[in-house]
Amino acid sequence: MNEHISSLLNEDCVRHIMCFLTDKEKGKFCLTCRDLLYLIKDVKFNDPVNKDNIEHLSYKKNFNCTYKISTVQDTNNRPISCFKIDFPNNKPTIIQKVVLPTNQTGNTFTFRLDENAFEKLLEHEDKVHKAITLIEQSITENESKKYPRLSLIQKY
């Protein structure tokens, strides 16, 4: 008896099951059966993922949160790792946790926040200030004023 999951459950059931899985489990689940592999193009992934790791994927638009790490020099020629998080369609999302790779020792993180989130952050600045020495709002000419970029520089 060699039945595939697609013969036991219809597509709607499989999609509903995926709502309860982690991003890693969603990918593994789709790879369990050739009949499920086509579903991976419809799966939405929520965990932050490095943009460089998904550029080759045909379904890279399905990742709700991507980040890019780049290194720049500060005024004393010390390297600073910039961690920039992007959201699709400029739709800001609340970030609950950010885990940096262990090889990143820099101290600059750039987040894109909407105005309400920025105001909320400033309300709690006393709590945030323990980990942050500088909050700098900068808007580049290509970005909308509605979604300013916020740089958080963490102290050592």
From Swiss-Prot:
Q: Which stretches make up the F-box domain?
A: 4-51
Q: Which domain of life is it from?
A: Viruses
User: What is an example of a Pfam family matching this protein?
Assistant: F-box
User: What is this protein called in UniProt?
Assistant: Putative F-box protein R637
